[in-house]
C-alpha cells in the first residue's frame, strides 16, 4: 500500500499568483485549501482580526469590554514558503467577501474571521520601485474611486 492510497490531499506547490486573484475559482481555491496550523488558528488569525475589527465585536485579548483599545499595524515576516502570502490572501479575500467564510473548514479561524468578513473594500496592486510610495497609494485609491 502506498501513502497516496491512504491520504487524500491537494498539495500546495505554488506561491500565490497575484495576477490570478481576480479569478473566482482561484480565490475559492486559496480559501478552501488554506492549511491552519495551531499558531495560525489560535494566535495569528485572531490577532489580525482583532486589529481589523473596528466594530468591536471581537475582543478575546481584552479583559474589560469598557476599556480603551488601540489597533496597530502588523508586519507578517517569515522565511520563503511559510505561507505569508497565503495568509494575507485568506484575510483579504474574507474581509472583502463574506461568502468565503463558508469555504473555511477550521471552526476557530472561521469564528475569528467572521468579525471582519465582508466589511472591507480591498484594493490590490503591485508596487514598483521607481515611484514614491505616497504617489502610488494615492493614485491607486483615486483610480479605484473613479471605478
For the regions a language model picked out, list residue spans one by one:
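Walker A/P-loop-proximal flanking segment of P-loop NTPase domains
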Residues: 1-82, 89, 94
Amino acid at each position: 500500500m502506498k501513502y497516496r492510497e491512504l491520504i487524500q490531499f491537494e498539495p500546495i506547490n505554488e506561491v500565490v499568483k497575484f495576477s490570478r486573484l481576480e479569478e473566482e475559482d482561484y480565490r475559492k481555491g486559496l480559501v478552501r485549501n488554506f492549511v491552519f496550523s495551531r499558531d495560525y488558528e489560535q494566535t495569528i488569525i485572531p490577532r489580525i482580526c482583532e486589529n481589523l475589527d473596528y466594530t468591536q465585536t471581537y475582543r478575546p485579548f481584552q479583559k474589560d469590554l469598557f476599556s480603551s483599545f488601540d489597533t496597530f499595524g502588523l508586519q507578517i515576516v517569515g522565511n520563503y514558503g511559510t505561507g505569508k502570502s497565503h495568509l494575507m490572501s485568506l484575510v483579504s479575500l474574507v474581509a472583502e467577501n463574506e461568502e468565503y467564510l463558508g469555504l473555511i473548514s477550521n471552526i476557530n479561524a472561521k469564528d475569528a474571521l467572521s468579525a471582519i468578513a465582508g466589511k472591507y473594500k480591498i484594493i490590490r496592486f503591485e508596487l514598483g520601485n521607481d515611484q514614491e510610495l505616497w504617489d502610488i497609494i494615492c493614485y491607486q485609491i483615486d483610480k479605484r474611486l473613479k471605478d
